[in-house]
Amino acid sequence: MGEKLICNNKKAFHDFFIEERFEAGMVLKGTEVKSLRDGKANLNDSFALIRNGEIFLHNLHINPYAFGNRENHDPDRLRKLLMHKKEIEKLFGKIREKGYSVVPLRLYFKNGLAKVELGLAKGKKLYDKREDMKKKDQSREMAQALREKSKSH
């Protein structure tokens, strides 16, 4: 079956250095799964917190299912993530270090199950963001120059 991407968190790559990646399952309601299959989710400004040895995803917005009834879900509810205890303990140890946080990078279906890819992230300073933008601009200009050169030949 493979993977089917639902959404990416491009803002996370702009605002953070991603040091390590983890995969986690999600505890969802039926209407949430149907909404995700329609691609109706937003990862911007979402983050994960660990409480009592369990990990929860905050600010993940999943639009209400269009054909749902009164049993439809709350779009911004807290969602529990499913990970091995050792992985959660490893994340918790890293989070206690200054400057680390856990952010979702992408949401996808893997073999029919909804998964979220979490990144152990460290915040970027303003000058780091500027540096990344300069590199991106330079690579874009180089690619454009190469295209122009290949067109002229």
Swiss-Prot record:
Location(s), subcellular: Cytoplasm
SUPFAM superfamilies reported in the protein's UniProt record: Small protein B (SmpB) (SSF74982)
InterPro entries in the record: SmpB, SsrA-bd_prot, SsrA-bd_prot_CS
Region (Disordered): 129-153
Pfam families on file: SmpB
UniProt-listed GO biological process terms: trans-translation
GO MF terms, alphabetically ordered: RNA binding
GO cellular component, one term: cytosol
Keywords per UniProt: Cytoplasm, RNA-binding
Gene3D superfamilies, per database record: 2.40.280.10
Transmembrane segments: none
Job of this protein: Required for rescue of stalled ribosomes mediated by trans-translation. Binds to transfer-messenger RNA (tmRNA), required for stable association of tmRNA with ribosomes. tmRNA and SmpB together mimic tRNA shape, replacing the anticodon stem-loop with SmpB. tmRNA is encoded by the ssrA gene; the 2 termini fold to resemble tRNA(Ala) and it encodes a 'tag peptide', a short internal open reading frame. During trans-translation Ala-aminoacylated tmRNA acts like a tRNA, entering the A-site of stalled ribosomes, displacing the stalled mRNA.
Similarity comment text for this entry: Belongs to the SmpB family.
The protein's name in its UniProt record: SsrA-binding protein
